[in-house]
Swiss-Prot record:
The keyword Nucleotide-binding applies. It catalyses: 5-amino-1-(5-phospho-D-ribosyl)imidazole-4-carboxylate + L-aspartate + ATP = (2S)-2-[5-amino-1-(5-phospho-beta-D-ribosyl)imidazole-4-carboxamido]succinate + ADP + phosphate + 2 H(+). Belongs to the SAICAR synthetase family. GO terms for molecular function: ATP binding; phosphoribosylaminoimidazolesuccinocarboxamide synthase activity. The keyword Aminoacyl-tRNA synthetase does not apply. It comes from the Bacteria. Its EC number is 6.3.2.6. NCBIfam families: PRK13960.1 (NF010567), purC_vibrio (TIGR02735). This is Phosphoribosylaminoimidazole-succinocarboxamide synthase. One of its GO terms (biological process) is 'de novo' IMP biosynthetic process.
Length: 367
């Protein structure tokens, strides 16, 4: 099979039994199972959740998004070989480490295939929980233009690009478009402060105001666990985004859990430690791909200016990127995944066929 065949680019057309619409995100698709199938799997697989918990099959793709657009490569390459399996493997590793360190659970109940999670339905917190240990990216761009207050936090004078911050900072933004919150524009990814969340905690999905402290603790503790593990591999954990939600436990109590993915090259910046000590930035995350795009296209403002989205979408749609650029991203993702997990990342020749076979034979979910 060709390289393009080994890439799972379309992941919302699997014949999984469902009575709801398939939710397709930038990278993952979610298939909500029927109530009967959810109850059957909870019973037969022994999942530690209430018997009426809705379950979903979450299938990751190899698509690559940047600047809110999906990009593709030459030769019909619609994604990055190994990217989906690498992201899931990294998240699986960190979630296991979180459990070993006594942190919160995740939404994952089962891992049938490197591309597939079986997850429990959660009530999401509508906050992108962002943690920063170094000043770079959007924080540096704002700081270099003279801004000193970021998400309600006053930054000191004299900071330099890419330097370590005096302390770990929590700089949240909105998840999705939220309306009717005083002082918060109805736009996606708007920076917010802790005081914004406290004053409107229910609008952001928190059940109790005290849970704001818990979310910040889980964010910082999770960051520190990953940062320490990466430091042992001579990698620098620069910044990251976590997501949280509530589930109901066996006793009927709400509990806050980690959702989505954690500590991956898609949701984080990770730098090579040796290069950083030499004053260079060597990205082991999607940031390297973003920088490639900014240098590849003659007018980078199209990628940065939100007022030019139609041009940006056309740019992504009409331009196949060089194969070597796509393969460099593949090497970045699989390389950091193998460092983190200590295991090779599987690259199935036909992932879609493999997924269907497993979900049919071991879970009876294929129609």
């Amino acid at each position: 099979m060709s390289l393009a065949d080994s890439v799972l680019a379309v992941n919302n057309d699997l014949p999984i039994r469902t009575d709801k619409s398939v939710h397709s995100g930038k990278v993952r698709s979610v298939y909500w199972l029927t109530d009967a199938d959810s109850r059957r799997l909870i019973k037969t697989k022994g999942y530690n959740v209430p018997e009426d918990t809705p379950l979903a099959i979450m299938v990751i793709s190899d698509r690559i998004s940047a600047f809110d657009c999906i990009f593709h490569g030459e030769g019909g390459l619609k994604g990055i070989p190994g990217k989906g399996a690498a992201l899931n493997a990294i998240s699986n590793h960190w979630f296991k480490l979180f459990a070993e360190n006594g942190l919160a659970d995740s939404h994952i109940l089962d891992i049938p295939h490197p591309f597939v999670w079986i997850v429990q339905k959660a009530r999401p917190i509508k906050v992108e929980a962002i943690c920063r240990q170094y000043i770079t990216g959007s924080m540096w761009r704002a700081y270099s233009k003279g801004e000193r207050v970021f998400c309600g936090i006053t930054l000191p004078e004299g900071l330099e690009k890419d330097q370590k911050l005096p302390e770990l900072l929590i700089t949240p933004s909105t998840k999705g478009i939220l309306t009717g919150i005083p002082g918060v524009p109805a736009q996606d990814d708007v920076n917010i402060s802790r005081s914004d969340i406290e004053a409107n905690y229910q609008a952001f999905g928190f059940e109790k105001v005290e849970d704001i402290d818990l979310y910040e603790k889980l964010l910082k503790d999770g960051f520190k666990v990953i940062s320490k593990a990466l430091a042992d591999l001579d990698q620098v954990f620069v910044d990251t985004k976590f997501e949280f939600g509530y589930v109901t436990d066996q006793d009927g109590n709400s509990k806050l859990i980690y959702m989505d993915e954690v500590g991956t090259p898609d949701s984080s910046r990770i730098w090579d430690g040796a290069a950083y000590r030499d004053g260079k930035i060597l990205e082991n995350s999607k940031e390297g791909f973003r920088q490639f795009l900014l240098n590849h296209f003659p007018d980078p403002d199209i990628l940065l200016n939100k007022d030019r989205m139609p041009e940006r979408e056309a740019l992504a749609r009409d331009n196949a990127l060089p194969l070597e650029a796509m393969m460099q991203v593949s090497r970045t993702y699989t390389g950091i995944a193998e460092k983190v997990t200590g295991a090779a990342i599987p690259l199935p020749a036909n992932p879609k066929a493999d997924i269907i076979k497993i979900l049919r034979e071991e879970y009876d979910l294929i129609v």
